[in-house]
Swiss-Prot record:
Source organism (scientific name): Schizosaccharomyces pombe (strain 972 / ATCC 24843) (Fission yeast)
Keywords: Cytoplasm, NADP, Nucleus, Oxidoreductase
Record-linked Pfam families: adh_short_C2
Lineage: Eukaryota, Fungi, Dikarya, Ascomycota, Taphrinomycotina
Protein's UniProt keywords contain Nucleus: yes
Entry-linked InterPro entries: NAD(P)-bd_dom_sf (IPR036291), Sc_DH/Rdtase_CS (IPR020904), SDR_fam (IPR002347)
Listed GO CC annotations: cytosol; nucleus
Subcellular location, record wording: Cytoplasm; Nucleus
GO MF entries: oxidoreductase activity, acting on the CH-OH group of donors, NAD or NADP as acceptor
Top-level taxon of the source organism: Eukaryota
Name by which UniProt lists this protein: Uncharacterized oxidoreductase C22A12.17c
Length: 261
């Protein structure tokens, strides 16, 4: 079983939320929500390994290390290619003696309807958003099992729970629903040695959304605004930390109330 975090009841809540001395790996960590996750983890004391594909991560890694006094590393990896994911974990294990936290944050969205998109576009979204999470988890699981501990926090989406409007994005919605069910399945399979959770962001200003606020989304959200990347990243901190030592199989929705209406 996964026991409570060490001295859980006697520790201050701020200490439980601290990641000091822990090693975190964030796939898709060079930009957007992934970059915010790396920054928040580093602020909490974790060393960070940024795994990127299209956006080089060296600049982000250097800035995060300098700002927080932690160690950061990078490597390039296409999560849809199993051999590349295996290679990434081999590189990670060269610098981290333990891997405490893994975040599969890879994701794309073409924003096309089922009629307009091609077979190849649909398959590509499933490959990146769902199969990519599996490929990362497939490599993280044996490491967690050998260590006897680990926390995997994947990026799902409110789109995996509801069909959000006004845009049409059937492939994205389908892939993120799959991520949520995959995480629940892994939480049960890995119950003896790891915690597995996911965060489902709502409409967020990030690189995926062009780095701008989308006014057309605001009327659909009770808060009448888009979320900030750091507001989303804070949820990952909780699930990755010792404070969440009884949380597994959780889909933490952070959407400004969108899925409540």
């Amino acid at each position: 079983m996964v026991a409570p975090a060490h001295n859980y009841e006697s520790r201050n809540i701020l200490d439980l939320l601290s990641l000091k001395g822990k090693n975190a790996v964030v796939f898709g960590g060079a930009r957007g929500i992934g970059h915010a996750i790396c920054s928040v983890f580093a602020e909490a004391g974790a060393n960070a390994f940024i795994v990127y594909n299209t956006t080089p991560g060296e600049k982000a890694a250097k800035e995060i290390a300098q700002a927080n006094g932690v160690k950061t590393y990078t490597c390039k990896c296409d999560v849809t290619i199993p051999k590349e994911v295996e290679h990434a974990f081999a590189e990670i294990q060269k610098v981290f003696d333990t891997i405490d936290i893994v975040v599969p944050n890879n994701g794309i969205c073409t924003g096309k309807s089922a009629i307009d998109m091609t077979y190849e576009e649909f398959a590509n979204e499933i490959n990146v958003n769902l199969l990519g999470v599996f490929n990362v988890a497939h490599n993280a699981g044996p490491i967690f099992q050998k260590q006897g501990h680990g926390s995997l926090v994947a990026t799902a989406s409110m789109s995996g729970v509801v069909v959000n409007v006004p845009q049409q994005q059937c492939a994205y919605n389908t892939s993120k629903a799959g991520v949520i069910q995959l995480i629940k399945s892994l939480a049960v399979e890995w119950r003896k040695f790891a915690r597995v959770n996911c965060v489902s962001p709502g409409y967020t200003t990030s690189d995926m959304t062009g780095g701008k606020f989308h006014k057309e989304w605001e009327p659909y959200t009770p808060f009448e605004r888009n979320g900030l990347a750091k507001e989303i990243a804070s949820a990952y901190l909780y699930l990755a930390s010792d404070a969440a030592s009884y949380a597994s199989g959780t889909n933490l929705i952070v959407d400004g109330g969108y899925t409540s209406i």
